[in-house]
Amino acid sequence: MEWVWALVLLAALGGGSAERDCRVSSFRVKENFDKARFSGLWYAIAKKDPEGLFLQDNIIAEFSVDEKGHMSATAKGRVRLLSNWEVCADMVGTFTDTEDPAKFKMKYWGVASFLQRGNDDHWIIDTDYDTFALQYSCRLQNLDGTCADSYSFVFSRDPNGLTPETRRLVRQRQEELCLERQYRWIEHNGYCQSRPSRNSL
């Protein structure tokens, strides 16, 4: 009789996993996203890495909205080059609105030419504006609509991180993105604030 219950349990687990939709078009984003409330300083405390060379840690981003309602951002963080050369690098991004207020096209580039540049989707998956935000970008989709190359940041207003309750919420949203256990924590030790200008790009 035990094997019957085991089969029932396996069927239930299989059915639950089959219900999850990992197509990018199915992902929920923040409803009624407010750019003005989102503006200001954010500390990246975890990220899912894409292909290519991006900022690695000590990442601080500042979002701003101009008088015409256009959003832009600057970011600074540490990058390791040639395995042993560490520098602080700056990146810049401008955002184009779409029909969904939480979905943008982000044109970004590094002040230094070796950094990644592109024009990616930039989605705000969730935020409460005051403590946390979860961002997601898919740069390349598979034929079945799932993502082949994505990156995602968990942002906090506090460099010390998030509360346990907020972390649980973020993990739930990461699972909805089919990215559970793919993030790594980002260190903030003041590296780029303490570096001389010759170590910045």
UniProtKB/Swiss-Prot annotation:
Pfam family, one: Lipocalin
InterPro entries associated with the record: Calycin (IPR012674), Lipocalin_ApoD (IPR022271), Lipocalin_CS (IPR022272), Lipocln_cytosolic_FA-bd_dom (IPR000566), Retinol-bd/Purpurin (IPR002449)
Domain of life: Eukaryota
Disulfide bond residue pairs: 22-178, 88-192, 138-147
UniProt-listed CDD domains: lipocalin_RBP_like
Location in or out of the cell: Secreted
Gene Ontology annotations of biological process type: cardiac muscle tissue development; detection of light stimulus involved in visual perception; embryonic organ morphogenesis; embryonic retina morphogenesis in camera-type eye; embryonic skeletal system development; eye development; female genitalia morphogenesis; gluconeogenesis
One GO MF term: retinol transmembrane transporter activity
Keywords from the UniProt entry: Disulfide bond, Methylation, Retinol-binding, Secreted, Signal, Transport, Vitamin A
Expression across tissues: Detected in blood plasma (at protein level).
Primary site of residence: secreted
Cellular component, GO, one term: extracellular space
Record: residues binding substrate: 116
Signal peptide as annotated in the record: 1-18
Omega-N-methylarginine modifications at: 139
Subunit architecture: Interacts with TTR. Interaction with TTR prevents its loss by filtration through the kidney glomeruli. Interacts with STRA6.
UniProt record similarity statement: Belongs to the calycin superfamily. Lipocalin family.
Reported function: Retinol-binding protein that mediates retinol transport in blood plasma. Delivers retinol from the liver stores to the peripheral tissues. Transfers the bound all-trans retinol to STRA6, that then facilitates retinol transport across the cell membrane.
Protein name, entry field: Retinol-binding protein 4
Annotated source species: Rattus norvegicus (Rat)
